[in-house]
């Protein structure tokens, strides 16, 4: 599905504001194509402002910003300003989060996530169109309504295209909707190459076909866990950390279908049970070598670049490696090989 495109290499921008600018500068200096923030314990947008200020080429994105914690007007505003300030380099990556977080952490409504996300993106684009072309804003949907936009609240038109919108998706319905309405897809680390090729890619292609769009206008991005080390001890430690991370993801109902695709569906209830008991060590012990290899790139440092390419080329367009418990020296060496 990735065709003959050059595989883009992306990196992470820390959400701590004091570190964001230096990290973005380092990514650009070292030849990375994009830098991404995540929404966890800090806001995902503020670091991108600093990154935009200190770089000129690096694509800048959120992976992800929680859409349902906000409304389309709020996201349209911050996306518009970041797109203008970065001179057209923003990728607005949106995700749904899960019901407990939306309702109990953000105190926002939940329901029909694929339909709601589709409408969220449509509302964003209606707002941006009103700002850019002066089109009357008259968006009324099932979940969102935006009908007032007076000159006082209308930002200036900009010389750049509206921000690209990527959607995080794992399930078929959300992935197909992503292919239909978004500019790109954000893949989760708990997605194997088999799941990508057998489930995600066909769903994306169905969505693209329904929208009548060409594949060349769409990007597929994926985070990939990497377990490596300078020696056997470091590699073993990285593998242990990666097994724990896979087990944590596998305990979450959202990723049960990924396990089922490999015939490992029975593992989910046990991981879920152990997670409720806080038995994290025991959970990691249930992830065997076959499972580890399905969800992560594993091996000595000098094998990582080739393994990443083998996993991603022809399937995805850009990769964000997530190194588990690796030294910075190992990370630098592996990524230097990748960029050659």
Curated annotation (Swiss-Prot):
- Would you say which domain of life the source belongs to? Bacteria
| InterPro entries assigned | F420-G6PD/mer, Lucif-like_OxRdtase_MSMEG_2256, Luciferase-like_dom, Luciferase-like_sf
* Signal peptide as annotated in the record: 1-20
Q: Which GO terms describe its molecular function?
A: oxidoreductase activity, acting on paired donors, with incorporation or reduction of molecular oxygen
Q: Which UniProt keywords apply?
A: Signal
Q: Name any one Pfam family assigned in the record.
A: Bac_luciferase
The record, for Gene3D superfamilies, names: Luciferase-like domain (3.20.20.30)
NCBIfam families referenced in this protein's UniProt entry, alphabetically = F420_MSMEG_2256 (TIGR03617)
Further comment found in the protein's record: Was identified as a high-confidence drug target.
The molecule here is called Uncharacterized protein Rv1360
Organism from which the protein derives: Mycobacterium tuberculosis (strain ATCC 25618 / H37Rv)
């Amino acid at each position: 599905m990735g065709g003959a495109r050059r595989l883009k290499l992306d990196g992470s921008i820390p959400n701590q504001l004091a570190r964001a600018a230096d990290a973005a500068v380092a990514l650009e200096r070292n030849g990375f194509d994009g830098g991404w923030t995540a929404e966890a314990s800090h806001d995902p947008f503020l670091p991108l402002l600093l990154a935009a200020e200190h770089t000129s080429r690096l694509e800048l994105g959120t992976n992800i910003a929680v859409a349902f914690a906000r409304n389309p007007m709020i996201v349209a505003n911050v996306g518009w300003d970041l797109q203008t300030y970065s001179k057209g380099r923003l990728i607005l990556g949106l995700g749904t989060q899960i019901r407990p977080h939306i309702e109990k952490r953000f105190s926002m409504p939940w329901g029909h996530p694929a339909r709601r996300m589709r409408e969220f993106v449509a509302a964003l684009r209606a707002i941006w169109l009103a700002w850019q072309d002066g089109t009357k804003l008259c968006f009324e949907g099932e979940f969102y309504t935006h009908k007032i936009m007076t000159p006082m609240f209308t930002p200036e038109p900009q010389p750049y295209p509206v921000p690209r919108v990527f959607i995080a998706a794992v399930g078929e319905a959300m992935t197909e909707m992503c292919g239909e309405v978004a500019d790109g897809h954000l893949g989760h680390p708990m997605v194997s190459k088999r799941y990508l090729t057998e489930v995600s890619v066909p769903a994306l292609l169905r969505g693209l076909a329904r929208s009548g769009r060409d594949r060349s206008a769409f990007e597929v991005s994926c985070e990939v866990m990497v377990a490596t080390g300078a020696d056997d001890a470091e590699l073993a430690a990285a593998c242990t950390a990666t097994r724990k991370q896979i087990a944590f993801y596998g305990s979450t109902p959202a990723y049960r279908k990924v396990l089922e695709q490999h015939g490992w569906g029975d593992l989910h209830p046990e991981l879920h049970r152990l997670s409720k008991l806080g038995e994290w060590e025991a959970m990691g012990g249930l992830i065997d070598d076959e499972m580890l290899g399905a969800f992560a790139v594993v091996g000595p440092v000098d094998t990582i670049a080739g393994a990443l390419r083998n996993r991603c080329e022809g399937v995805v367009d850009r990769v964000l490696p997530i190194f588990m418990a690796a030294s910075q020296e190992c990370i630098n060496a592996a990524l230097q090989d990748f960029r050659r």
